[in-house]
A protein has these predicted regions:
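Pocket-lining segment of extracytoplasmic ligand-binding domains
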Residues: 2-4, 33, 69-167
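Short helix-capping segments at alpha-helix termini
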Residues: 9, 66-71
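Hydrophobic residues within well-ordered alpha-helices
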Residues: 41, 87-88, 174
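Secondary-structure junction motif
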Residues: 53-59
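Conserved hydrophobic residues forming the short capping helix/wall of the S-adenosyl-L-methionine
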Residues: 63
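Short amphipathic alpha-helical coupling segments at ligand-binding clamshell hinges
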Residues: 167-177
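Periplasmic-binding protein-like
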Residues: 179-187
Length: 187
């Protein structure tokens, strides 16, 4: 979404160097809230991320793809740590998190509370990807958080960017070191 960054204008001096890990869009729900699908969020108290954060912008786009708005839920603007705490304390029913797979905070929540993962799939996911092509299809494998089955979702890729004035030999050396056997072993 360009809207939150419109005032700053295009960053035409940046160049993509390579893709890093994907940031998976995860919708967590307390199991006792009976939320199995996105539509089940209607009327529930939902943590959508801090205002204008990446998580919150993702949440707005995903609501839109499902034909819903924040008016359909009781929104709490919480960063994901706050949202997890609110879920632990029974103060919200669901939370949106954008992170790499295996997030320690999500794992910890799963140890202390019974949680479910809400899928982002079907036509809604296809609408999301069509309108915002920086999203990709993704899956949260069952083994990641000990769920009964994989959860379909969407993700965005983290990308290392550099100023276009950075000399090509510096970029080459960086990539050579990162993707060398030693570099890969280190990361």
């Amino acid at each position: 979404g360009a809207a939150p960054f419109a005032a700053e204008g295009a960053m035409s001096d940046l160049r993509a160097v390579f893709s890093l890990q994907s940031e998976v869009f995860t919708i967590l729900a307390r199991r006792d809230a009976n939320i199995a699908s996105f539509d089940d969020l209607k009327g529930k108290r939902v943590g959508v991320g801090a205002p204008n954060s990446g998580v919150e912008i993702n949440a707005r786009m995903i609501f839109e793809a499902h034909g819903m708005t924040y008016k359909d839920v009781k929104v709490d603007y919480l960063n994901y740590g706050e949202a997890i705490d609110q879920m632990k304390n029974g103060l919200i029913n669901a939370a949106f998190v954008t992170s790499g797979l295996g997030n320690a905070t999500i794992r910890e929540l799963g140890v202390t509370k019974k949680i479910a993962f809400v899928p982002v799939d079907g036509e809604a996911r296809q609408r999301l990807i069509k309108k915002y092509p920086f999203y990709i299809e993704s899956t949260i494998p069952a083994a990641t958080y000990g769920t009964a089955s994989d959860t379909p979702t969407a993700a965005v890729m983290n990308i290392l960017v550099a100023d276009k004035k950075l000399p090509a030999d510096v970029v080459y050396d960086l990539l050579k070191n990162i993707f060398s056997p030693t570099g890969l072993e280190t990361i």
